[in-house]
Amino acid sequence: MTMRYIIKRKIYWTKEFDSSHFLELEYESKCKRIHGHTYKVEVEIEGELNEEGMIFDFTHLSEIVKELDHRLIVSKEWVKEVGDLVIIEKNRKILKVPRDEVVIIDKPNVTAEYLAEWFGERIAENAGSNIKKIKVRIWEDPRSYAEVTFTLEPQGS
């Protein structure tokens, strides 16, 4: 008797990075102040092998982390860019920060949930048609993380 089998392929990647942020909250919290984390990102990508024999190039993941590492992460809704500066107005703060020290994300807040979503979207931008699922987990500390899963579906031809 011959057996038929189906291969399901995944890659897994993880890296730590250091970044600072603050949150916009309706209630009082120390997290409204600028603070930092040694984040850990975990990525799992499911798909088929591409022409090079890979599901996804790990280098693309490292580039996303490099963009975030040792930078202040802020919401697009809070900033105004003036020349080489980013002016951030939020929580009774006005900060002027050199543009190259800031990552502006197109999310309403800089929570672990939104950061995981942003990271997943960046991966999806580089994903080939061979990618089926992207899972991103962002750890803010050893006890807490946020996770998102993207299911990619081909759009028309």
Swiss-Prot record:
Entry EC number(s): 4.1.2.50
Catalytic activity, reaction form: 7,8-dihydroneopterin 3'-triphosphate + H2O = 6-carboxy-5,6,7,8-tetrahydropterin + triphosphate + acetaldehyde + 2 H(+)
Binding site for Zn(2+): 21, 35, 37
Cofactor(s) of this protein: Zn(2+)
A Pfam cross-reference name: PTPS
Role according to the record: Catalyzes the conversion of 7,8-dihydroneopterin triphosphate (H2NTP) to 6-carboxy-5,6,7,8-tetrahydropterin (CPH4) and acetaldehyde.
Record protein name field: Putative 6-carboxy-5,6,7,8-tetrahydropterin synthase
Species this protein is from: Pyrococcus horikoshii (strain ATCC 700860 / DSM 12428 / JCM 9974 / NBRC 100139 / OT-3)
